[in-house]
Amino acid sequence: MAQYTNYILVCGGTGCRASQSEQIIENLRAAVEQYGLEDTQVIRTGCFGFCEKGPVVKMIPDNTFYVQVQPSDADEIVREHLVKGRKVERLLYMNPETRELVPDSKHIGFYKKQLRIALRNCGFINPENIDEYIARDGYVALGKALVEMTPEEVIKEIMDSGLRGRGGGGFPTGLKWQITRKVQAPQKYVVCNADEGDPGAFMDRSILEGDPHSI
């Protein structure tokens, strides 16, 4: 498996895709190849959440955050940031109050108070690559539930956690599983209800697009 020291994360959420993020990805990959940067990988991620500033490009490991990037900016980003070691200042986020440039996304007001739990992988991994999800401890809980626990223990764990549905009703998940467990039927189904019409569930799209394996 190839080893990389630099990663270029490009938002592949609906908003950024509508603003040519796919062309940005293509141009970035072409520039990386042109400059012979074998230690650099371009990754399409899920939504970063900061859609009003998209398309968004994030450089890892230094967390430089470029906003409103255009396909024509790709070569400059690779040449200046990776080859010459200089940030492309005109693409950095500007604090609207202080007018100061904020290179690191951790210091942007929109992000700095966030504690992501359900959305922890969105904007960080390639949603179509199961290996990247597993590398972030993906499916560990599922493995434990299937191998180390009984169905009753799993339901009790969910009940005790207080986990609720993400829709407006907030129905207790453990109770839902308990009711389903008691139903006598030769075959049962798991249905993913991703309702974007519910104002309280608009985040469903972000998870489905950006971290589908978590579903």
Give short role names for the model-derived ranges.
Residues 1-215:
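Feature of Fe-S/electron-transfer and energy-metabolism proteins
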